[in-house]
Swiss-Prot record:
InterPro entries: Metalloenz_LuxS/M16, Pept_M16_N, Pept_M16_Zn_BS, Peptidase_M16, Peptidase_M16_C, Peptidase_M16_M, PqqF-like_C_4. Keywords: Allosteric enzyme, ATP-binding, Cell membrane, Cytoplasm, Hydrolase, Membrane, Metal-binding, Metalloprotease, Nucleotide-binding, Protease, Secreted, Zinc. It is found in: Cytoplasm, Cytosol; Cell membrane; Secreted. This is Insulin-degrading enzyme. Changing K898A: Greatly decreased activation by polyphosphate anions, and deficient in activation by small peptides. The SlyX motif may be involved in the non-conventional secretion of the protein. Substrate binds at L359, V360, G361, G362, Q363.
Length: 1019
């Protein structure tokens, strides 16, 4: 993979997480021309410059304008008359690299605090409540150089939201009581990351460079850095927050992006009105001209012990900041070649030796002044013994690039691919789009901000050679991550406790790498045959339907077809479910289905990589019902890739060496589940408890030893012997072509695997356990790795139907913001606090998910206390407030998909759940608008109140690593201080000791009836 892994080694810090479940022919450049009228804004002294020539894609119907305000804020305005949601983002070009040395995490803490009250809007949840009532949401993140705040809201309420948002940058309160509470949220956020290998490796990389360089700082912060130590040293953190904000939150370091239905003139006036008062303190842009890795930090080897059983090799070179060369992007060119996965590539050779499975190569962001070039691979057991040889191969490939010299045709191909990607770019969700653009405005001229990261302009062999010259053995840093180093390390990283050992790489090894010769196995990539050439948008057929239509229904297959009538891009989504009773019949078969598809994807990788580069990707997974295949992207060459995958499926020959390697990697991934987050464990156990048939990780591990090569070889024809295929073909494709695609898939399977249809009785889905009225069950487990508890509380309500769906969703809409405000902001139970619907197997209910240092039975009591307060809140709610919630939910539900793949995913969800309610949003919103407050109170009293006659509750308590035991229920009188609402006394729950016995004693719900009459659905 080229140019990647920025997340793995450079995670940003997202905050205020309301939801946890929470990178041809060039295009014709279209310019947004000057409007005919002279704006009233032209002579506005608050505006220094207006830029109306914003280069955009020819397919982009939105209007853009750039502004530079007199106070130095850069602005991009986007007028989109069709948008359901408006959005805005502000990016401050300051991050954790600018933290005071004695208060690590201050910039991140400042980001948290800005959400909690301003002079104009002092109520601490004013902003989040306003957004929640108007179908909005918000978030923010802090990285080394940026603090990025963003929100979305229903399009009518942009001004109200933007006014509240602007106050963050004008006059935040930094209220002392909020500060004392919110430090716990930051601490909980850090605690969540402490045992996460990505965060640990990122901090270790920072810690092993120049300790005086800002890069070495600890960016998240925790209670020790933001409260305990400052208190000991007599530092007032509130004063430091005020000082940090008044020093660095300067308009000359800010960039804003606003998207709304309003005209560009109206958006201009809005931004000028709200942001021209932000003070310009003329803060110099932080720059870091010295690289954190100097000579003494090079030619070093780091042996690192991970938390999970992973084996990775990270090879890093310090390189200069290439940002200014974005029009030629030499790092992209080298990443494209070094990270290539086709025949003759570095990865191809390392895989054939049995040393690695995956490779990522390319430039990685540092900060203004420095960057890195990385080549990262995962290691097989054999690969761990050949690290020196793997790195020698890397230098042989780099030597090949030097010997061949920069190739203009390779640059041209990258340029063409990027140009096609820009021309046919999917529309993005407003919130993500504004956040991304606000960050880019600091780096690129206003008129080129949309194109800068796509359109390559000049081939600069001199720059390619310059970067290539940095990729030498004398500049290398090597990190090996493996459990095999346990007990053999002598250093501990300060903030995460990572165990590691540092050694100088011996000079004879450096010499060996310097003498790397040319390896005849290495070849430059050949011309990419998957680059699309036909971009014709097919005319809508006369019988085109607004929703997927069933155009084929036989014993072998059901084919749903929908010609795109919204996005008009040369793309399609082809989704297939291959239903087989053999895929999940027991843990052994589940393992074999998984390994078959992993081996299949592994063998297809060289072929399919070129397609992926050309914007055509596929996904292949085993499911509890069989196999899922999707092919997405440009429709031009789609059938070629699909045919290759289907033929390979039906004629697959397993390579013995790859079988052993992939089986071993699978065993490690099963073992590594123990190190997942406590809240993820809670969700996993609940799924096992509630689903009729579900195999545990332990059962899969136990059965994996029985998977032998002969057994797997015998399983594949059995799996393919009888199938039922259900498909959705959606996009720039005709009905005739769709029927042809389906026929090709069937013919290939029949010809090569002699596939026959399944019996209708074999097509039944799994069902959900039905809890008894007034029943409350608790299941307890311990997480061996994390020192936090996790809980999922599930109130099962009923089968899915239009009415039940709306009762539940409206209740969830009403409690969502108060839940976050009460349990996270005020009570500080933890960083992860979530409430919302849970749906599985056609059954649904309300769920709460919390991760906390507090014990699970305490979290349970606080959720119950919160629910009681919500009963009163709903009873006291005005009709106007109630209607706001109905409106907010309606807007959320009717928010149109922004791209073909999102619309397709929605329809596919209806197909795999076998509900087929393609017009669900309109049908359910129409019902929603008939609901009254009394309906919701009745729903609560019948289903959710402590004494509700039809209350059905399951709680999963995941204990922290250091807790031996914990009561399942308890009273907490000492905790009930004046600020806490009283928790109700709870009955003694039934403790689940054995999952199988629990399920055996309870009935199952029936399956939901499909919404569609299949005879009528056929065209």
């Amino acid at each position: 993979m080229r140019n990647g892994l920025v997340w793995l080694l450079h995670p940003a810090l997202p905050s205020t997480l309301h939801s946890i479940l929470g990178a041809r022919p060039p295009p014709v450049k279209r310019l947004c021309g000057f409007p005919k009228q002279i704006y009233s804004t032209m002579n506005n002294p608050a505006i220094q410059r207006i830029e109306d020539h914003i280069v955009k894609s020819p397919e982009d119907k939105r209007e853009y304008r750039g502004l530079e305000l007199a106070n130095g804020i850069k602005v991009l305005l986007i007028s989109d008359p069709t948008t359901d949601k408006s959005s805005a983002a502000l990016d401050v070009h300051i991050g954790s690299l600018s933290d005071p040395p004695n208060i690590p995490g201050l910039s991140h803490f400042c980001e948290h605090m800005l959400f909690l009250g301003t002079k104009k809007y002092p109520k601490e949840n004013e902003y989040s409540q306003f957004l929640s009532e108007h179908a909005g949401s918000s978030n923010a993140f802090t990285s080394g150089e940026h603090t990025n705040y963003y929100f979305d809201v229903s399009h009518e309420h942009l001004e109200g939201a933007l006014d509240r948002f602007a106050q963050f940058f004008l006059c935040p309160l930094f209220d002392a009581s909020c500060k004392d509470r919110e430090v716990n949220a930051v601490d909980s956020e850090h605690e969540k990351n402490v045992m996460n290998d990505a965060w640990r490796l990122f901090q270790l990389e920072k810690a092993t460079g120049n300790p005086k360089h800002p890069f070495s700082k600890f960016g998240t912060g925790n209670k020790y850095t933001l409260e305990t130590r400052p208190n000991q040293e007599g530092i007032d953190v509130r004063e430091e927050l005020l000082k940090f904000h008044s020093t660095y939150y300067s308009s000359n370091l800010m960039a804003i992006c606003v998207l709304g239905r309003e005209s560009l003139d109206d958006l201009t006036n809005l931004v000028v009105k709200l942001f021209s008062e932000v003070e310009n303190k003329n803060v110099p842009l932080p720059e870091f001209p010295e690289h954190p890795f100097q000579e003494e930090h090079l030619k070093q080897l780091y042996k690192i012990v991970p938390i999970k059983d992973i084996r990775n090799l990270y090879v890093t070179f310090p390189i200069p900041d290439l940002q200014q060369y974005y029009k030629s992007n030499p790092g992209h060119y080298l990443g494209h070649l070094i990270g290539h996965e086709g025949p003759g590539s570095l990865l191809s050779e390392l895989k054939s030796k049995g040393w690695v499975n995956t490779l990522v190569g390319g430039q990685k962001e540092g900060a203004r002044g420095f960057m890195f070039f990385i080549i990262n691979v995962d290691l097989t057991e054999e690969g761990l013994l050949h690290v020196e040889d793997i790195i020698l191969h890397m230098f042989q490939y780099i030597q090949k690039l030097r010997a061949e010299g920069p190739q203009e045709w390779v640059f041209q191909e990258c340029k063409d691919l990027n140009a096609v990607a820009f021309r046919f770019k999917d529309k993005e969700r407003p919130r993500g789009y504004t956040s991304k653009i606000a960050g880019k405005l600091h780096y690129y001229p206003l008129n080129g901000v949309l194109t800068a990261e796509y359109l390559l302009e000049e081939f600069r062999p001199d720059l390619i050679d310059m970067v290539l010259d940095k990729l030498r053995p004398e500049n290398v840093r090597v990190a090996i991550v493996s459990k095999s180093f346990e007990g053999k390390t002598d250093r501990t990283e300060q903030w995460y406790g990572t165990q590691y050992k540092q050694e100088a790489i011996p000079e004879d090894v450096i010499q060996k790498w310097q003498n790397a010769d040319l390896n005849g196995k290495f070849k430059l990539p050949t011309k990419n045959e998957f680059i699309p050439t036909n971009f014709e948008i097919l005319a809508l057929e006369k019988d085109a339907t607004p929703y997927p239509a069933l155009i084929k229904d036989t014993a072998m297959s059901k084919l749903w077809f929908k010609q795109d009538d919204k996005f008009f891009l040369p793309k399609a989504c082809l989704n297939f479910e291959f239903f087989s009773p053999f895929a999940y019949v027991d843990p052994l078969h589940c393992n074999m289905a998984y390994l078959y598809l992993e081996l299949l994807k592994d063998s297809l990788n060289e072929y399919a990589y070129a397609a992926e580069l050309a914007g055509l990707s596929y996904d292949l997974q085993n499911t509890i019902y069989g196999m899922y295949l999707s092919v997405k992207g440009y429709n031009d060459k789609q059938p070629i890739l699909l045919k290759k995958i289907t033929e390979k499926m039906a004629t697959f020959e397993i390579d013995k060496k790859r079988f052993e390697i992939i089986k071993e990697a699978y065993m490690r991934s099963l073992n590594n589940f123990r190190a997942e987050q406590p809240h993820q464990h809670a969700m996993y156990y609940l799924r096992l408890l509630m689903t009729e048939v579900a195999w545990t990780k332990d059962e899969l591990k136990e059965a994996l030893d029985d998977v032998t090569l002969p057994r797997l070889k015998a399983f594949i024809p059995q799996l393919l012997s009888r199938l039922h295929i259900e498909a959705l073909l959606h996009g720039n494709i005709t009905k005739q072509a769709a029927l042809g695609v389906m026929q090709m898939v069937e013919d290939t399977l029949i010809e090569h695997a002699h596939t026959k249809p399944l019996l209708p009785s074999q097509l039944v889905r799994y069902r959900e356990v039905q809890l008894p009225d007034r029943g409350w069950f608790v299941y307890q487990r311990r997480n061996e790795v994390h020192n936090n508890c996790g809980i999922e509380i599930y109130y099962q309500t009923d089968m899915q139907s239009t009415s039940e769906n709306m009762f539940l969703e409206l209740f969830c809409q009403i409690i969502s913001e108060p839940c976050f405000n009460t349990l996270r902001t005020k009570e500080q139970l933890g960083y992860i606090v979530f409430s919302g619907p849970r749906r599985a197997n056609g059954i649904q209910g309300l769920r709460f998910i919390i991760q906390s240092e507090k014990p699970p039975h305490y979290l349970e009591s606080r959720v119950e206390a919160f629910l009681i307060t919500m009963e009163k809140a709903i009873e006291d709610m005005t009709e106007e407030a109630f209607q706001k919630h109905i409106q907010a939910l309606a807007i959320r539900r009717l928010d149109k998909p922004k791209k073909l793949s999102a619309e397709c995913a929605k329809y596919w969800g209806e197909i795999i759940s076998q509900q087929y309610n393609y017009d669900r949003d309109n049908i359910e919103v129409a019902y929603l608008k008939t609901l009254s407050k009394d309906d919701i109170i009745k729903f609560y009293k019948e289903m959710l109140a402590v004494d509700a006659p039809r209350r059905h509750k399951v709680s999963v308590h995941v204990l922290a690593r250091e807790m031996d035991s914990c009561p399942v229920v308890g009273e907490f009188p000492s905790q009930n201080d004046i600020n806490l609402s009283e928790a109700p006394p709870l009955p003694q729950p039934e403790v689940i000791h054995n999952m199988t016995e629990f399920k055996r004693g309870l009935p199952l719900f029936p399956l939901v009836k499909p919404h569609i009459n299949f005879m009528a659905a056929k065209l």
